[in-house]
UniProtKB/Swiss-Prot annotation:
Record flagged with keyword Amino-acid biosynthesis: no
One annotated GO biological process: fatty acid biosynthetic process
Keywords of the record: Cytoplasm, Fatty acid biosynthesis, Fatty acid metabolism, Lipid biosynthesis, Lipid metabolism, Magnesium, Metal-binding, Transferase
Cofactor(s) listed in the protein's UniProt record: Mg(2+)
The protein, known as: Holo-[acyl-carrier-protein] synthase
Enzyme Commission code(s) on record: 2.7.8.7
The reaction(s) this protein catalyses: apo-[ACP] + CoA = holo-[ACP] + adenosine 3',5'-bisphosphate + H(+)
Role description: Transfers the 4'-phosphopantetheine moiety from coenzyme A to a Ser of acyl-carrier-protein.
Pfam families in the record: ACPS
UniProt-annotated binding residues for Mg(2+): 8, 58
Location relative to the cell: Cytoplasm
Family: Belongs to the P-Pant transferase superfamily. AcpS family.
GO MF assignments: holo-[acyl-carrier-protein] synthase activity; magnesium ion binding
């Protein structure tokens, strides 16, 4: 059963100025996300990744009904499985989708109770 749905959208240009700001990156990205972020060479890819992860965290907090006020960005870690599918670390009941264009990143998160309804 669906317990909550959250979505977020962000202009990538709003985060590009922060891709070299260690203080901002440390506040937003979980260490596991930061490790992946640091592998990217291009500013464009770094900005896409940062905007996407920011959107996931906002969408996840909305889906839980808490907002970021009850969770910190560090409490939420979005990784990718071997096929590239994004997931929230330590929450198998969260289902994540991230997309971006050249200018916009968006994320959609559904949180379920773990029961499958056919």
């Amino acid at each position: 059963m669906i317990m909550g749905i959250g979505t977020d959208i962000l202009e990538i240009s709003r985060v590009i100025q922060y891709i070299d700001d260690n203080k901002f990156l440390t506040r937003i990205l979980h260490p596991d996300e930061r490790e992946r972020f640091d592998t990217f060479q291009s500013e464009k890819r770094k900005a896409e990744y940062l905007a996407g992860r920011f959107c996931v965290k906002e969408a996840y907090a909305k889906a839980l009904g808490t907002g970021i006020g009850k969770l910190s960005f560090q409490d939420i870690c979005c990784l990718n499985d071997v096929s590239g599918k994004p997931y929230i670390k330590d929450d198998t009941n969260a289902h994540v989708s991230i997309a971006h264009t050249d200018t916009i990143a968006t994320a959609y998160v559904i949180v379920t109770d773990g029961n499958v309804i056919l």
